[in-house]
Amino acid sequence: RDEVAVRNCPRVYPVKPIENLVRARQTLLAEPGPSPWRLVVLGGGPAGTEIAANLWRLCAEAGIPRDITLVAGERLLAGAPPRVRALALESLRSRNIHVLEATRARRIEPGEIVLETGRILDYDLAFSAVGVRPSPLFEESGLPTGPDGGLLVDSTLRCTAHREIFGGGDCISLRGTTLARVGVMAV
């Protein structure tokens, strides 16, 4: 997954930790804001797809005019079965959420996102759901980690060095296997 250069952008919220989304929600609901709010979600995996849909629901329930764009990378839910992908695209598009495929953000600056294609997306709030990675907690605490920084566990989800510690979800590295990161953080 690609990292995006972000330049001092207080209106860009990484989706993790969850507190970032709470702050973004408070901003969206507290301020009169533009009409419509221009909301951009970066990342076409499960987390980005869920964020885009939840933004739509939040704004719809609060009566907030919105223009939501999801920058999906190569394609929305690339690792999902074709039927799941088609249903997700249909659901998002039926809510007038713009899904941009075959492009990524190259650079993010205050108020604008420059895509690889050269297109510029203006935004009022943006959400980054790219590059799902385990927390650095495991490396910082001296626990064994896999190549991606996840807690190294065996087939029973026990830490390889401390049998009393178990891990699961996107925070682990299963010894001998590469796991897809799907945006769920469980410890």
What are the residue ranges of the model-derived segments?
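Rossmann-like NAD(P)H-binding beta-loop-alpha module
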Residues: 24-65, 71
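A conserved beta-strand/loop capping segment in the N-terminal third of enzymes
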Residues: 1-7
